Each structure stands twice: as structure tokens, then as C-alpha cells.
């Protein structure tokens, strides 16, 4: 399943990020990809050795960790270190699949269950640059407002179309979920959403408490901690 997570960053935060990123050192984006991806990748990324990068990636982690909808959809166990990329002048990233495992500075290795893109450019400011994701439900084309994030299974083939006008800037990361299986994770997300909707409409009740008990028992049964 694919999820749109709105408002991860406020407009003020986005403007500040963009101001900092205009001063950043950018390097060839192929430095962080494998052999297959390097053949179709043509973009730039912020140099991860810079102090500016360290500060910005911490802010992204804090923002997603504090976003209730992100947590409910991803049920994250481990988040990768966020990276930042830039596309301009017809730069693109052809169809590829993300690696199943990635190195992690604290945990050694992590499994990539979900991929996330946090948009930092207003969609009207550039042409092209759509994230195209192929999954079992078909093809999805994504171009979200700045500050919004999209979550999708890392097992999906995906690409970024050429940016023919303007500049597309984004942050991206991977998530190892407590729930490995996409279908089980989607069911928990739907159940959680319905519980929250019922609570807001009717308040607390024995029936809602029973559903909440079911949610946590399923999470206990399926989670990998």
C-alpha cells in the first residue's frame, strides 16, 4: 500500500530547509547506490560528511518520529539515516528496486520494508520529477506539496521522471517496520484509523476498548522487536 502523510514539515520548516540546502555541498548521487541503480541514476545528493547534513537529517528524523500518522502507517522499528537529493536540468532516476538490506550506523544492518520521500519543493516550481511506483495495484504517479511525505513498499519498482524545468529537492529514507508483512501492516493501519474515527465520533465505550484490545493483541502477535 502507498500512503500520503501530510504536514510532516510546516511551510516555515520547509523554507528554512531550502535556505540551508542552497548552501549545501552536493555530490554525484551514485555514491550511495548499488551497481544496478548506478546505471540509471542521474541526480545529486548532499555530502553526508558535512555538519549541515548532520543537523538537517536529525531534524527530519525528529519530524517523522513525532508524526502520529507516519507512526500508525509505518509502525517503525528502525529508520535509516535520511538523505537529501536534487534533480534539475533533465536529471532523472530510472526504474529500479531498493536494496533489501542497508547498513545502519547503530544497528549494523536493517531490512528495508518501506521507502519514504519527503518533498521539499513546491510542485508548481518544477516540471517532471514525478515519483512513479509500480505495485500490485498498478502504477502510481506522485508529486506532493512541500512538507508532505509518501510511504510505499520498498519491494516496488519505482523511478523519478526527468525534471525539465526548475529544481526538485527531497529527503528520502528507508524504514524497517515492526510488521514485516505489508498486508498485515495495512490491516493494522485500517483498524487503527477506524478506532480513532469511532472515538472521535462517539467517545470512549466498551466496544471501542474491545477493538483497541484486538489491535494491540494483533500487534503483539505479529510484531518483530
Swiss-Prot record:
Claim: Oxidoreductase is one of the keywords in the record: yes
Biological process terms in GO annotation: DNA damage response; intracellular iron ion homeostasis
InterPro entries: Oxoglu/Fe-dep_dioxygenase_dom, PKHD_C, PKHD_hydroxylase, Pro_4_hyd_alph, Pro_4_hyd_alph_FE2OG_OXY
Keyword vocabulary terms for this entry: Dioxygenase, Iron, Metal-binding, Oxidoreductase, Vitamin C
Binding positions for 2-oxoglutarate per the UniProt entry: 168
Annotated binding of Fe cation, by residue: 96, 98, 158
Class in the EC hierarchy, top level: oxidoreductase
Enzyme Commission number(s) of this protein: 1.14.11.-
Protein origin, superkingdom: Bacteria
Co-factor: note: Binds 1 Fe(2+) ion per subunit.
GO terms, molecular function: 2-oxoglutarate-dependent dioxygenase activity; iron ion binding; L-ascorbic acid binding
Pfam families in alphabetical order: 2OG-FeII_Oxy_3, PKHD_C
PROSITE patterns referenced in this protein's UniProt entry, alphabetically: FE2OG_OXY
Name of this chain's protein: PKHD-type hydroxylase YbiX
Amino acid at each position: 500500500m502507498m500512503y500520503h502523510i501530510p504536514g510532516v514539515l510546516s511551510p516555515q520548516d520547509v523554507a528554512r530547509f531550502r535556505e540551508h540546502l542552497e548552501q549545501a555541498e552536493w555530490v554525484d548521487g551514485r555514491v550511495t547506490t548499488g551497481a544496478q541503480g548506478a546505471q540509471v541514476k542521474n541526480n545529486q545528493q548532499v555530502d553526508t560528511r558535512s555538519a549541515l547534513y548532520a543537523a538537517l537529517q536529525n531534524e527530519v528524523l525528529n519530524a517523522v518520529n513525532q508524526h502520529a500518522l507516519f507512526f500508525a502507517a509505518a509502525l517503525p522499528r528502525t529508520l535509516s539515516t535520511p538523505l537529501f537529493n536534487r534533480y534539475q536540468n533533465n536529471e532523472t532516476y530510472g526504474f529500479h528496486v531498493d536494496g533489501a538490506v542497508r547498513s545502519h550506523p547503530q544497528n549494523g544492518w536493517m531490512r528495508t520494508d518501506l521507502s519514504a520521500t519527503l518533498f521539499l519543493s513546491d510542485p508548481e516550481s518544477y516540471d517532471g520529477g514525478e515519483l512513479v511506483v509500480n505495485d500490485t495495484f498498478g502504477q502510481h504517479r506522485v508529486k506532493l506539496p512541500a512538507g508532505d511525505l509518501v510511504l510505499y513498499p520498498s519491494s516496488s519498482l519505482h523511478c523519478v521522471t526527468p525534471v525539465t524545468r526548475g529544481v526538485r529537492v527531497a529527503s528520502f529514507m528507508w524504514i524497517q517496520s515492526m510488521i514485516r508483512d505489508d498486508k498485515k501492516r495495512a490491516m493494522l493501519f485500517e483498524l487503527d484509523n477506524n478506532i480513532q474515527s469511532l472515538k472521535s465520533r462517539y467517545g470512549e465505550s466498551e466496544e471501542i476498548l474491545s477493538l483497541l484490545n484486538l489491535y494491540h493483541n494483533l500487534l503483539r502477535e505479529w510484531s518483530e522487536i
